[in-house]
Amino acid sequence: IIDKAKAANIPLVFLNREPLKEDMAKWDKVYYVGAKAEQSGEMQGKILADYFKKHPEAYHSNDGVIHYVMITGEPGHQDAVLRTEHSVKALKAEGMKVEELASDTGMWDRVKGQEKMAAFLSRYGDKIDAVICNNDDMALGAIEALKAAGYFTNGKYIPVVGVDATTPAVQALKDGTLLGTVLNNAKKQGQAVFNLSYVLAKGETPNKDNTGFDIVDGKYIWVPYEIVTKENADKILGDK
């Protein structure tokens, strides 16, 4: 696509799935609008760290170590790799001791998330302190498996975090079954794409003044993720 756009001298804007840096470097009129996947992982780690700092009783083994399970997206997918890596890095950066009990792919899918969580519960049971999922659909699936195992009733609880702030996930936040999620702000990304494309169509060089967004390295507009919890869900989503 980049080669064809370059040959036709047509500016090209990619959205939400970042091309490789070497592809972005092929031409000076290629742009990307999106969010940094590592930031979403960092925010998941922050949500969990805040929870365990406030709830020391949440360590099921009473050893001060967060024993977690990870349900990941598509193997090799950049978002899955970065969210997985940086959620754990953020926990450690917050001073948390962590141990991975198990990790498996749920392929971004709710049913597969439920299946993987059921398998984790069968093997590890109450040893699990936290569930980290690369997206909300898998987190909601994990919650279904936890409900079937008696969690979220009679004080039995495991914190679950996801990414995307989907409508069903926000309902789970309000229900108290999902601890937190991270918003990939589609509205702001759409505005950035429109502003950028408009400037390019006029033959101008994009900058913060004419797009309203910082242009990093002359090619990238990064729209920050936002932490969403039960406490701020209505406000954050009202701004979407």
Question: Where are each of the predicted segments found?
Answer:
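Hydrophobic alpha-helical
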Residues: 1-12, 86-87, 101-172
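Flexible loop/hinge segments that line or gate small-molecule binding clefts
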Residues: 2-39, 57-65, 166-174, 178-179
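Solvent-exposed loop/turn segments at secondary-structure junctions
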Residues: 18-22, 38-39, 74-78, 105-110, ...
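Hydrophobic alpha-helical segments within soluble ligand-binding/sensing domains
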Residues: 32-64, 113-114, 165-169, 185-204
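Short, solvent-exposed amphipathic alpha-helices that sit
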Residues: 40-44, 78-97, 112, 116, ...
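Hinge/cleft segment of the Venus flytrap/periplasmic-binding protein
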Residues: 64-75, 79, 191-240
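Short beta-strand elements in bilobed, periplasmic/extracellular small-molecule ligand-binding domains
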Residues: 67-70, 91-110
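Exported/periplasmic ABC-transporter solute-binding proteins
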Residues: 144-187, 191-217
